[in-house]
């Protein structure tokens, strides 16, 4: 299991800044066969039907393509699998790289090699770089409220060495980071 979030950075007026990306849309892709896309939150306000106006669709594929799941041949839905691949490529930073190489990296989303060598590796590398450059909160380095004041007194490269910070940020791939 991997709990991740998305983060990005920019330079604004000569200052490097970063923030977690807040995604308000809700998407669940099941087995590359079904996609639920909507706006409802899992709370009474959204689900009781008396307050918020919410909408969602269930897209059940009826066209199938040859695919792989956990190293085995699999018939996945054309729409659901293409949506999953597109989102994964965006989050992993593969949209700008060569098409043939990137497609194969996200073909089998439940294989051990994808999880360790691609997903976890990119999330860990990005998390480490952001930690070094921005000294982000929340952080796994802060284990208790007692740790917080000391952590907040430390500065990242964005404050202490702008050139080195820019150099480090060039190694960020996509937006995927580990959730602390």
Regions found by a protein language model. Give the residues of each.
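Long, C-terminal catalytic modules of enzymes
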Residues: 1-180
